[in-house]
């Protein structure tokens, strides 16, 4: 079924609706990728019953494939009506043989990590039957959530990072490119506080290293700091390269505060006291990393009940840059009040350009360049020439009649610059009327050279 039309064709750029009913959370990756072998962009999302297609479509786990030459897209269903919840968005991977792997899980409401492999290379139109990894015995029947797929060539191994077993970051591993999976151990563990332990974002170089940033707990329940480490050679290291957990495979997990602190709760920047941090995005190039972190500014409440309102409802986005040795932390933008009344620490989020760490996209109800409040969340592009100390901003969307949320800058082909988001209205992670849209441009050689400077 086709759901997209080319809206604004140009010679080198276009804006497009890719899926007319979909949204995602931000703790799965890759949620979108470009396959240069067939000049397509793939993006996974979850349909909601409030959107087009109604209850018959609500809860579908979908992959939309955008033809970058024509601007037309096709939506393929991985699992019909699994569960209407944006946490269930699939993670995508291109195997060395060109076939796709998609993995997805429900939001703590059953005990399975699910996956499908495409029948043919570079073709998402047909998939092998769904398979499952059953966490019931390992997790005591308390559910599993999220999928994050990272292939390391040096190990001939794919990792899938899942939230399971005490709601800790855990691992599945595959030695056959995602055809079969086995339990790989835990990254972190600690006594549980509130809802969950360790919200983690990952970035892998595809060769021998996976970097990660993680929280203590959910920011509603705990005044989080943010920590950084990396996986290499069956060991977990801190930012300085010191081994903190080995062997990693089969590990029972360590306390994440053993890693290097990127953001310490209570940090003061420009007179604002910043607390209750959350991980938003992480990308890398060479030995450098860039991360976006959300946090509360000048909070007076501390831990919250689920329906409790913040007395000072003021969130910020921070930009953190790692030069291979040290982290530097900079203010990025005002993020506004909490996005949802019962999710007091939700923001519109932001994304780092995987091909240019000096470029970010954010969603905010305040123009980051002028400070002017807007009726809806808009998308802005930010660029820095000094490692994040200062920013220039351009509006990507303006005067919108609906919110524009959770941007992604799509990896896979440095010659294609694609930023995606979903737009519409959201009352909860389970109820939304939203469509997946994006802006795509093909960069010429001078553009690519400028990005790598």
Residue ranges and their predicted role:
Residues 4-453:
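Extracellular, repeat-based ectodomains that mediate carbohydrate processing or recognition
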